[in-house]
Amino acid sequence: MAETLTVEVMFGGGAELLFNKVKRKEIALPPLKTFLPDSQNQNWTLKELLIWLKDNLLVEREELFLKDDSVRPGILVLINEEDWELHGQLNYELKENDKIMFISTLHGG
Amino acid sequence: MPVPCKRGCGNNAVLKRPKTGDAICKECFFWAFETEIHYTITKGKLFNKGDSVAVAASGGKDSTVLAHTLKTLNERYNYGLNLMLLSIDEGITGYRDDSLETVKQNRDDYEMPLKILSYKDLYGWTMDEIVAQIGRKNNCTFCGVFRRQALDRGAAMLNVKCIATGHNADDIAETVLMNVLRGDIARLKRCTAITTGSEGTIPRVKPLKYTYEKEIVMYAHYKKLVYFSTECVFAPNAYRGHARALLKDMEKIRPSCIMDIIYSGETMSIKEEVSLPTQRLCIRCNFVSSQEVCKACVLLEGLNKGLPKLGIGKSSKVKKLLDEYNTRQNNLETAVKDLEDCNITDKKTSKTCKNISNGFKQKECNATNCCTNKTERNVEKNNEKLQTVLDKYSLENNSQVKLDEEDSDDSEIKHQDEDDTCSSSCGRLGVGF
Ligand SMILES: [Zn+2]
Ligand SMILES: [Zn+2]
């Protein structure tokens, strides 16, 4: 019941600048219902993870990372090193020890 | 749930390609990514066997991936290219000094010689010093104009056939969009060209022209390439930032829009009565210019005279500024004297050619006698030139009014082409990134 879900989040390509220069961090997510009592999902998905990140780790202005209920276009998301577009994007259900990476394409080249 | 690679290789897919929507595995992605660039290079005839090619290297993702890919393809397909890295040090503390470290890493990783040219050596000013003079509003104008010429000079010193830049498909689509939004037909016509550069200049080529930004970043990630990502510390251009955000929003809904916009730019035909600026040589520095005196020389003169706004604002303002300046100087002779003094000072203090003192060809400008004996014969010429120049600022700039509007703060940068604007460094960071 009160078990936490452990996942690793990683930031690169400049996205780390929005997270206090943190490049990787292991996080322990509480049961979803304690974090978001109104959530329609039973289990953590990327959609709720974004909300958790905004509340807990994001230090820069929110609009630099998020747009509507997703990441800002131009930020790539990898789930265990694979493009989230192959895995349902926001609807992807998090599993124990998942590695979720956010890479900005918006920084200078 | 694993998704199989579209190519039927038996591996699991790792990414969805924006161009095609195909799910593809890592190995097939590398192959497709590199082969498409090879195709772009051969179809566009970007290089000839034996060419020396300078890769414009910023340490960022695009130029890092470009250097890596060109090295790979050069070996795989026997291009016979002599590749080198060319970097410009704008003198921006905390930005360029860090990224230059990445470029040095590129040099070691890819075993390519590296040439770094600084604004300080070329122009006598760092961007930090320029910003201290002009504030943060128009600094991208200076940076873009100086960078463009600095790359030309570096390429001439390296004696290369062409300069390869890291502009990707998203960049080019963004530029097409920007030129449409500004009604800038002259640039709209040029900005999709895979090779740019008129006679007398070293051509710029864009091998990543059809490569999506997403794939460049994914390629760098999977290949574990080290690149530098931060924002330029100076103010970005808001208008371009909006265009970029719009494009990214549309790309999310329909990724092929990037290719479609480029295609539109390539195939759009321009009505004949649209007059396009003609190219000539700057009477001072002899680099290609659409004016008698090039933008870099005008901006530099402004800086050196303590009139940093010279060349940025509308032509009427330039005239006013110069009038005020001349009043301060009492008469034109004082101004001429001033220019001579500048030249003499330059001779003593600098071994590097500076725009203010030059009227000689870049090609002659490599020895220690660069700004000494060549300058002598130009001092007297400068007297009449100065008069010409002063007249010119108020007269000929009329044709430029549209481009000189103050609110389009980087409009001047792309006066000749789109290559070396801050769009490849700070301009794209418009929405705060
Ligand atoms: Zn495959
Ligand atoms: Zn010039």
Curated annotation (Swiss-Prot), chain A:
Primary site of residence: cytoplasm
Position of the Glycyl lysine isopeptide (Gly-Lys) (interchain with K-? in acceptor proteins) cross-link: G109
GO cellular component: cytosol
Pfam entry (one): Urm1
Processing and modification events after translation: C-terminal thiocarboxylation occurs in 2 steps, it is first acyl-adenylated (-COAMP) via the hesA/moeB/thiF part of the MOCS3 homolog, then thiocarboxylated (-COSH) via the rhodanese domain of the MOCS3 homolog.
Keywords tagged on the record: Cytoplasm, Isopeptide bond, tRNA processing, Ubl conjugation pathway
Ranges that cross the membrane: none
Modified residues (1-thioglycine): G109
Gene Ontology biological-process annotations: protein urmylation; tRNA thio-modification; tRNA wobble uridine modification
Pathway membership: tRNA modification; 5-methoxycarbonylmethyl-2-thiouridine-tRNA biosynthesis
Record InterPro entries: Beta-grasp_dom_sf, Mopterin_synth/thiamin_S_b, Urm1
The keyword Nucleotidyltransferase belongs to this UniProt entry's keyword annotation: no
Domain of life: Eukaryota
Annotated compartments: Cytoplasm
Family affiliation: Belongs to the URM1 family.
Biological role stated in the UniProt entry: Acts as a sulfur carrier required for 2-thiolation of mcm(5)S(2)U at tRNA wobble positions of cytosolic tRNA(Lys), tRNA(Glu) and tRNA(Gln). Serves as sulfur donor in tRNA 2-thiolation reaction by being thiocarboxylated (-COSH) at its C-terminus by MOCS3. The sulfur is then transferred to tRNA to form 2-thiolation of mcm(5)S(2)U. Also acts as a ubiquitin-like protein (UBL) that is covalently conjugated via an isopeptide bond to lysine residues of target proteins.
PANTHER family: RURM1 PROTEIN (PTHR14986)
HAMAP family for the chain: Urm1
Name this protein carries in UniProt: Ubiquitin-related modifier 1 homolog
Organism: Bombyx mori
